[in-house]
Amino acid sequence: MGRVAVDLYAEQIGSALADAQTFRKYLGGCAGNIAVGVARLGLRSAMLSCVGQDEMGVFVTQTLKNEGVVTDLLRATPDHLTGLVLLGVDPPEHFPLMFYRQNCADMQLQPGDCDEQFFRQSKALLVTGTGFSTSAMRATSHHALDLAKTTHTAVVLDIDYRPVLWGLTTLGDGERRYQLADEVSHQYQQILPKCDLIVGTEEEILIAGGDDILSQALDNIHRLVSAPIVVKTGAKGCRIYLKGQREPLTAEPFQVTVLNVLGAGDGFMSGFLSGWLKNAPWQTCMQYANACGAMVVSRHGCAPAMPNNEELEYFLQHSDAQENILQGRNIARRHRRSTLGSAADREMFVFVFDHREQFRSSCEVTDNSRAVVKAFRQQLFSGFQLALQQDPQSRLAMLVDPGYGRTDIASHIDKRVTVGVPIEKAPSLPVRWLGDKPLYQEILQRPAPWFVKVLWEYHPKLDEQIQRQQLLRLKELAGVCDQLDRRLMVELVIPNEYTDLGSATSNAMSAVYQHAIYPFWWNIAGDFSTTRWRALANILERNDPHSRMILSCREQSEVAALGPLFTSAKASEKVSGFVIGWSIFWQAWQRLLKNEIELEEVPKVIAEDFLQCIRLWQEA
């Protein structure tokens, strides 16, 4: 319960906010970050707050849902904007913040937003100190605490003290973390008796305890409540003060290179709760908390920096043995599952009409104009939409041409549809990138949810220098996709005349992984046996278990002939869909050029054939 907003993080490291040129947009706010953090660590998390009925509110809500956070108690208000924060990264000491939160949405919660039945289903309620900084929110927050007690829901307090949000500093001084104020201490001391766990920095303990001497502040708190007090001490780790025990419990910190301390406390809290709510020993809770905090401080952003269970486990197992472990590929690959999701969760049926060269050549032969191609592609898109209407349950995707009609199509794409756009100039060997812009800029300007597809040739008969260039280009592309959080589909091309297509495919995939390149999807063509598909699946299992193969049907001329191909591919659990285009639309294109069908007839033909392909897959 509490702050959930949008963080705009300066991308220029070591720069004052005044000099920042570009910003990355993330979900933020103390409570929002923790909701994401605990969800990534396997807890069932829900968000009790408000967002504005604005585009940023849509972003916050959708991001929470994507992270697995329940949003049933997240209300949208038409009268208030979603809060914004500008953040700078100037390590090791300066991390400026500017809060744009005047009368913002997440401070508009009402007592009626606290659903008693939902509370009864919940093991704990986490509240943050900012929720008590205004009179209206104070009343709602106390109502929530009282309801938690009635429903036997544990109360966790993240002190989360920001002087600027209590009106104690100028509006631009968001970086200040500590300023003694008797009235603020008084408000915190109304909260403390209702808490079962209290977490804060040393400075926050001082303000909650109403004293500038830590030991006295701790005593003051424990006179009000018996709850354990967890004190975050940054690079020194943490301490737990239990009432009646003179010496605190301590745990060793993890030594990492600090990039950004903002959000570290939220990572710490997420890790601590992942142990505490499962009744883990105090040492385990502290170990999880210190590890999660350490991982977050090494990254840009707050919510997106939160680790998942797989990362946490790997970090705890290997942090002593591997120097700079957080900059290594093993952690990065595991973290990517949180930022991009898992391909295992995305069975896809992809309709592709990005055959640029084929259409261009066809127009030259038949003396038709580009306008004819554009009109035909619009009908292909209409056919895809018709298929989507008739089969709304399947996950349909489309791969669109970056030139012909992309802008027109993009404005009409249903949000349920996964969209990809090629990045390569086809044909090109070594692979060359589309457009005149640098690769980073080209991908940056595309909608963020769209995936990147590259047609990439690699096999042992290529000259060794070409092989090296292909791998270097692919590594460059994968690096840009990682920086921009874009999913990468590698469409592996091996010539038809290759005598052992299965071995060549295995060798190419292995070479990619040996160069620390991890595609989200592999687009694989081949009429392979079930044994070969399983061998390819083993390569994924060894190198990147969350990646998946998508079967390419580019060599098939008849839809009806796809059944046996689908059956073989589905013998492997690592194949999660198919890509098809030519087999569906090329005959219609040829018939259109010969005036054998009208343009308006194309959508029905396309939809019927695409849906038949989906049925064949589901029956295989």
What is the predicted function of each stretch?
Residues N324-L462, V559-S576, W586-A620:
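Alpha/beta catalytic barrel-like cores
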Residues I409, P460-V480, G526-E541, V559-A561, ...:
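Active-site-adjacent beta->alpha loops and helix N-cap segments on the catalytic face
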Residues P163-P248:
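Conserved phosphate/ATP/ADP-binding segment of small-molecule kinases
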Residues D146-T150, G210-N330:
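Conserved phosphate-binding/catalytic region of the ribokinase-like
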Residues A397-D401, W450-Q470, L501, A508-R532:
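Catalytic beta/alpha-barrel core
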Residues M1-V70, L109, F351:
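Glycine-rich phosphate/adenosyl-contacting loop at the front of the ribokinase-like
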Residues F351, E491, W522, G581:
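Conserved, mostly hydrophobic/aromatic
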Residues R44-G129, E313-Q322:
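Conserved N-terminal subdomain of the carbohydrate kinase-like
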